[in-house]
Design a protein with these regions (language model features):
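Cytosolic regulatory regions of ion transport systems
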Residues: 1-455
Length: 455
């Protein structure tokens, strides 16, 4: 697939980081030569200096042969014009634009986005999506990620198994899932180091530090977590590092959360701090050096339940999380923009990594993948994806059993939603019209699974 990306800042770079893992021909256009040089050192891309909204530039990069344009510069107008040019002059079939300004996002103006006005197939707001992902962790304290499916009726969530004294540690996953069935839940996958275990074997037992993925009706999430020794202790005290769109959206939502007692934002840039403070009511915004003992004390860092580092600097985010991890009761969360810091981040105790590329790409997966996808999430770089597949009466899959699908060995149908019933880790089930399938797809199997569930 030929993909043209407009913008080489953090959002554009994060997209390249994920898309470069596939068999894609990627062109990156930006006016900043230094940013292009930086991204070209790390990834196999074609860097082009110029404005993505310029017709001459689009022609020079072969836009006529492009399968997709993703315009993610920091200028909304440039992104929208780029999509218009790509459609009108070059007939690009799929066009995605980053839009941050609220006036462009107002539902009243949704009719702007069509072929007769602004031909944009999908509008994305990466920073807001990151903030929403972070807020999802507040709904299920102790989790590493929460992925909502079926219009919010089902969650697939992950957590690290730290407690080895629970009864479940003595039993096979087959036995555990028989118990979880009482809550209409199931363990659907385990990540052990870099090895993924799909739950289709009888003799699999939990080990300490396994990352466990559970599918569960939303209302039973907390009860299931408790069975694995994870107590539901709300994040009452929050400290966020970095004044930006992510921290603003998070803080504004947390101000209305009855479980939150205090929220502080620390920002080293005085102007940014003042600007953020003007738009918040209950949040304490503190300007000063983020590593300063006095600033950390003013923010209540030592007693925080959760520390969220979302600055634009990966090193700062990791240092903050390293400090937070010294307090065993503080959950550390760090935003990572570059893959080179992932390994370091995983070695920080109590640290949850938020990979910008993974969150950003999740928002556009249903446009990237050639399958009938309602919802899709990337789990991490080279960790695969989870798709919600919808099956209509014209689907060739209707009437087949799960075995008949001949799923690749490293991918699996995790769950089926039929009527009001959840069926987990199915094998002999016969697919019916209007069933919804939750499918794990390994990175190497994406094309094969696309063929199985082709639109």
């Amino acid at each position: 697939m030929k993909i043209v990306i407009g913008g080489a800042s953090s959002v554009g770079k994060s997209l390249v980081g994920y898309l470069s893992l596939g068999n894609n021909d990627i062109v990156v256009v930006d006016k900043d030569a230094a940013k292009l040089e930086d991204i070209a050192k790390e990834y196999d891309i074609q860097p082009v200096k110029g404005s993505i909204s310029n017709p001459d530039i689009q022609e020079s990069v072969g836009m006529k042969k492009a399968d997709m344009l993703i315009a993610v510069t920091e200028n909304d107008e440039v992104n929208l014009v780029a999509c218009q040019v790509a459609y009108t002059l070059f007939g690009v079939p799929r066009k995605i634009a980053r839009v941050d300004s609220q006036y462009f996002l107002n539902p009243l103006w949704n009719k702007l986005y069509n072929e007769k006005s602004l031909p944009v197939d999908l509008v994305i707001t990466p920073d807001i999506e990151i903030a929403k992902f972070l807020l999802g962790l507040y709904k299920l304290p102790g989790s590493m990620a929460v992925y909502p499916f079926l219009n919010g009726n089902l969650n697939v969530f992950s957590f690290k198994q730290k407690d080895t004294d629970i009864p479940f540690m003595k039993f096979s996953l087959k036995h555990i899932n028989s118990k979880l069935a009482e809550l209409s839940a199931a363990v659907v996958m385990i990540l052990r180091g870099n090895h993924r275990i799909l739950v289709n074997e009888d003799e699999v037992y939990l080990q300490r530090n396994d990352v466990i993925y559970i599918a569960c009706p939303t209302e039973s999430n907390i009860d299931v977590m408790r069975l694995f020794g994870v107590d539901h202790n709300p994040y009452e005290k929050t400290v966020i590092f970095g004044a930006n769109a992510i921290s603003y959206y998070m803080s504004s939502q947390l101000e209305n959360d009855d479980n939150v007692i205090s929220c502080s934002v620390v920002e080293s840039n005085v102007d940014k701090a003042h600007k953020l403070a003007e738009h918040l009511n209950k949040t304490s915004v503190i300007a000063g050096k983020m590593m300063s003992d006095r600033i950390l004390e003013d923010a209540g860092f030592s007693s925080a339940d959760i520390s969220v580092a979302v600055t634009e600097n990966d090193k700062d985010n990791l240092l903050i999380s390293l400090l937070a991890s010294k307090n065993k009761d503080t959950q550390a969360v760090s935003l990572i923009n570059s893959k080179e810091y992932n390994l370091l981040a995983t070695n920080i105790r109590n640290n949850t990594i938020i990979d910008r590329s993974v969150i950003t790409i999740s928002g556009i997966l249903q446009y990237l993948r050639r399958a009938r996808i309602n919802e899709a999430y990337a789990l991490g770089r080279e960790m695969g994806e989870i798709w919600e597949i919808r099956l209509g009466d014209d689907s060739s899959n209707v009437g087949q059993s799960i075995k008949d699908l001949q799923m690749p060995e490293n991918s699996a149908v995790l769950a089926i939603y039929q009527g009001n019933e959840f069926i987990y880790n199915p094998t002999d089930y016969q697919i019916k019209e209007d069933d919804k399938l939750i499918v794990y797809v390994s990175p190497a199997d994406i094309k094969a699974v696309e063929r199985i569930f082709y639109r």
